[in-house]
């Protein structure tokens, strides 16, 4: 599905080739990390490699996949979201552990000065307020 003449294809193929050469996911990642060192931690290329590697080694377990992606680092939350979506589409909701399906607690503790203790509802309201103000001022 990925055009074979694209850069993205070469990244995915490189990661898959490493998976086929090594018995452990961290060995495959070490080679990919070295190859993609020049890219920022949120760049698509190292994160695509992480997703490929984790999916290859996780034995169809989302929990294992998320754990592996966390151990490799980079943009962990975005990688987990993309892979969880793939698991849900491919295997159904039954493939996703209940702990990932439960609602988050309302209270949030942060490192943001002045907002060390907040809530999802407060953040949601503030976001809507900002969007409405931006729309009014355009």
Located regions from the model:
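Catalytic phosphate/nucleotide-handling subdomain of diverse soluble enzymes
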Residues: 51-131
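Bulky hydrophobic segments
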Residues: 131, 135-138
């Amino acid at each position: 599905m990925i055009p074979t003449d694209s850069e993205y294809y070469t990244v995915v193929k490189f990661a898959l080739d490493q998976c086929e050469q090594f018995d452990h996911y961290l060995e495959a990642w070490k080679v990919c990390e070295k190859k993609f060192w020049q890219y920022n931690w949120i760049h698509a290329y190292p994160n695509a490699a992480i997703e490929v590697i984790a999916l290859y080694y996780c034995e169809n377990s989302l929990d294992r996949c998320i754990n592996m992606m966390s151990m490799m680092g980079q943009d962990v939350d975005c990688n987990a979201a993309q892979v969880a979506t793939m698991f849900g589409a491919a295997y159904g909701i039954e493939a996703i552990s209940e702990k990932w399906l439960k609602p988050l607690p309302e209270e949030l503790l942060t490192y943001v000065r002045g907002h060390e203790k907040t809530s999802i509802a407060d953040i949601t309201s503030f976001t809507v307020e900002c969007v409405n103000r931006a729309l009014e001022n355009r």
